[in-house]
Amino acid sequence: MKQEQKHTENSSSGIPSILSKVKLLHGDRVLWVIIPILMVISILVVYSSGVKYDTPTGNSTTANLWKHCIIILIAGIALLIAYRFNAKFYRKAAPLAYLGSLALTVAVYFIGDSTNGAARWIDFGFFMLQPSELLKLSTVIFMARQLSMKQKSITTQRLVPSFNPLKWREPAQKKIWIEGTLPVLIPVALSCAIILPAHTSSAMLVGAISIMMMFIARVRWQDLLKIGAIVVVAASLFVAIGAGRSTTIRNRIGTFFSNNEVPLGSKPLNQLTDTEHAIIAIHDGGTIGVGAGQSVMRAKITHPESDYMFAFFVEEYGIVMALFLLSIYAWIFVRAIHIFRHSEWIFAGLLAVGLASLVTVQALLHILVSVDAFPETGQNLPLVSHGGTSMLCTAIALGIILAVSRQIEEGSLIPTDVGEKFTTPTDHNL
C-alpha cells in the first residue's frame, strides 16, 4: 500500500507524462529528459571547441567530433546497462568494485602516463583510462553500503578512536577500530590518500561527499567534528612537507589570489592566466552569447573542451543558457533528494544522493573555477566536457540513480536487512 502511494506521488509530481508510455523509460522522468539534453549540449560545445586544434584540411575537428560521439554512445549504453541492474546487485558488487578500482589507481603510478606532472592515465591503445574516476564512483557506492549496514547502531557507534595511540589496546578502543573506523573511515581515507598525489581536487571531492553521506546517515556529530579536524591537520601537513603535488597546489592558490591584485584590463594579453581568459570569455558572451562556433577565447584557453568548458559555453551561448545549464545540475540533485525520500531502503537512498552529489558538486567546482571564485582544480563539467572516463563514470552514476527510481516506481526496492529500512522521518538527516 505504501509503495502504491509512493508510485502515485511520483507519477503526479509534474514529471513529463509522455515518457511514462515508453516502456524502457521507467523511473524518474525528469532525469530521462535532463540526461539527453546534457549529451546534446556536450556534442555541440566539444565540436566547437575542437576548432582550436583544427588543421588546414579541417580533418581534426571532424575526427574530434566523431570520437566524442562514440564516447557519448558508449556512455549512453553504459547508462542503460547500469539502469537495468537492481540496487541489491550494487550492494553485493560494491566491495569488488571498490577493491578493483583501488588496485587500478595504485597501478597507474607504476604503469600510467603522466599529464601535467601527474600520473593519471593507463593507455590501453584504443582507450585512455583514468582509474581515479572509477575510484570516486566506487567509493561512493561502497560508502552507501557500509553506512547502511551500520544503521542499527549508527547513532551510538563511535567511528573515531582516541587520538592517544597508547589507548588503542583497550577493549573499548579495539571495538571502535573494528566496528567503526576500519569498515567506514579507512576505505575513504585510502581512496583519498591514493588519489591525492595525482589529483588533489578529486581527493577533496571524495572526502567531502563521504562526510556528507555520513551526516545524512546520522553519524554522531562528535565524530564528524573529529573527522573534520583530522582532514584539516592532514591537509596542512601534506602541503607543509611538500608531498605529492603540494607545490602545484600552492602555486594555484597563489595565482588565484594574485589574479585579483592587478586589474584585468591593465595586464598584457600574453600574461593572462587561463582563468582570466575564462572571465573575458564570460564577459564577451553577455546575455545571449556570440553564437555557436564564434568563440574567440577558445584559442587562448589551454583546455576549453574540458577544464574551462563552462566559460566557453557562456561565451558562445550567453548567460541565459548558462543559467539553464546551472538549473539542470541543480535539478539532478533535487531529483536525487526526491528519490531518497521515497526510498524505504537506506542503502538505495544514500546511493542516489551520494552519486548525485558527486555529479553536482563536481559541476559546482568547475563553474566556480571558471568564474574565478575558486583556485584551478582541473575538474571538468560532468556529462558535457570532453573526457572518456569521466563521461563513462558520470553516465554509470546517473544510470544507477535511475535504477533506484525505477525500483521505487515498481515497488521492488526491498531492503536486504530489516535494520536498513527507513521507519520514521528521523532515520536520516535529509
Please report, for each region that a protein language model flagged, where it lies by residue.
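A juxtamembrane structural motif centered on a specific transmembrane helix
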Residues: 1-19, 147, 362-430
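Hydrophobic alpha-helical scaffolding
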Residues: 23, 243, 267-268, 299, ...
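Short linear Ser/Thr-Pro motifs
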Residues: 39, 48-50, 201, 295, ...
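Extracytosolic (periplasmic/ER-lumenal) interhelical loops and adjacent juxtamembrane/interface segments
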Residues: 272-291
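Hydrophobic alpha-helical transmembrane segments of multi-pass inner membrane proteins, especially
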Residues: 32-48, 55-271, 311-372, 396-400, ...
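Transmembrane helix boundary and interhelical junction motifs in multipass membrane proteins
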Residues: 199-204, 289-294, 304-306, 374-377, ...
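Cytosolic juxtamembrane amphipathic/interface segments immediately preceding
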Residues: 12-26, 59, 166-170
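Long extracytoplasmic/lumenal interhelical loops at the membrane interface
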Residues: 286-320
